């Protein structure tokens, strides 16, 4: 369990509270969560992070009015750099996007620029924004993570309390380069404790990681309360600490909530994430 869910930085969040919807553009709806809350517990310093990466958001419910008052729609893709001071709280992001619904913009590019400015200000870091037409997705198939799925092992699990000790001694033997995948990642929102469902891809070069130990570790997140981004950084740090791979990439894609999905990745090597939807997205 985390020990910062009552931190003063979280007390003003709209998450978990009844909140009215604004009908006009209002960037003040965006709320930031300091990344330092969980990074301090992991022993990470902003000036010497052991990884690079991004939080990739997909915005499925994005609409505004053009100058003629006709509603416009697009699908947004947001990449929030992992070096930003803050992550963006998802409910506030949804409320902010809804505030665009009855607001006029002269062009899609004007919307993109406004999103980039507002999100960068909230996150205190680099944010890339792409807005795509719905027609761009008509021929886009569902994807699956590359790699070996470790979910169908003949093991018994009866403890769902989070612990990274499952990874102690989990790596050994010859050096391999491989990619392991699990679709059984489930954690809970830090504030509301609502379930967050995800698939995770772990790509590494190093001593071979025991599949059973890794699966038990991932399943132990099942009753753990943290935001998506924080879980991915915890997985990265735990695998690095106990398995000591030469290179490591952790990439998770979570199911959507409120018209948004969040897909964080962290890596200490070159990595270009595939951004297509998985089956549950």
From Swiss-Prot:
GO terms for biological process: queuosine biosynthetic process; tRNA modification. Catalyzes the NADPH-dependent reduction of 7-cyano-7-deazaguanine (preQ0) to 7-aminomethyl-7-deazaguanine (preQ1). NCBIfam families: QueF. The active site is at residues 189, 196. Keywords: Cytoplasm, NADP, Oxidoreductase, Queuosine biosynthesis. Substrate binds at residues 88-90, 228-229. SUPFAM superfamilies: Tetrahydrobiopterin biosynthesis enzymes-like. Belongs to the GTP cyclohydrolase I family. QueF type 2 subfamily. It comes from the Bacteria. Pfam families: QueF, QueF_N. It is found in: Cytoplasm. Pathway: tRNA modification; tRNA-queuosine biosynthesis. Homodimer. The keyword Membrane does not apply. The keyword Cytoplasm applies. It catalyses: 7-aminomethyl-7-carbaguanine + 2 NADP(+) = 7-cyano-7-deazaguanine + 2 NADPH + 3 H(+). GO terms for molecular function: preQ1 synthase activity. NADPH binds at residues 90-91, 257-258. One of its GO terms (cellular component) is cytoplasm. This is NADPH-dependent 7-cyano-7-deazaguanine reductase. Its main location: cytoplasm. Its EC number is 1.7.1.13.
């Amino acid at each position: 369990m985390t020990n910062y869910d009552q931190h003063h930085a979280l007390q003003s969040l709209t998450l978990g509270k009844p909140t009215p919807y604004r009908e006009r553009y209002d960037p003040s709806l965006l709320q930031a969560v300091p990344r330092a809350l969980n990074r301090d517990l992991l022993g990470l310093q902003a000036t010497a992070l052991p990884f690079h990466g991004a939080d990739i958001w997909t915005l499925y419910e994005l609409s505004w009015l053009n100058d003629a008052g006709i509603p416009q729609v697009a699908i947004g893709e947001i990449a929030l750099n992992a070096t930003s001071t803050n992550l963006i709280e998802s409910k506030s992001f949804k409320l902010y996007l809804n505030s665009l619904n009855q607001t006029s913009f002269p062009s899609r590019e004007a919307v993109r620029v406004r999103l980039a400015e507002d999100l960068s200000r909230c996150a205190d870091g680099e944010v890339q924004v792409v807005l795509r037409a719905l027609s761009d997705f008509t021929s886009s198939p569902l994807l699956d993570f590359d790699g070996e799925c470790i979910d169908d092992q003949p093991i018994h699990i009866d403890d769902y309390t989070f612990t990274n000790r499952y990874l102690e001694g989990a790596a050994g033997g010859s050096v391999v380069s491989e990619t392991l995948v699990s679709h059984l990642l489930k954690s809970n929102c830090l504030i509301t404790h609502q379930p967050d469902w995800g698939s995770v891809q772990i790509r590494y070069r190093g001593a071979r990681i025991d599949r059973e130990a890794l699966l038990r570790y991932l399943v132990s997140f099942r009753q753990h309360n943290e935001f998506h981004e924080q879980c991915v950084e915890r997985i990265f740090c735990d695998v690095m600490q106990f398995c000591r791979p030469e290179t490591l990439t952790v990439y998770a894609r979570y199911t959507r909530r409120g018209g948004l999905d969040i897909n964080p990745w962290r890596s200490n090597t070159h990595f270009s994430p595939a951004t297509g939807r998985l089956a549950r997205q």
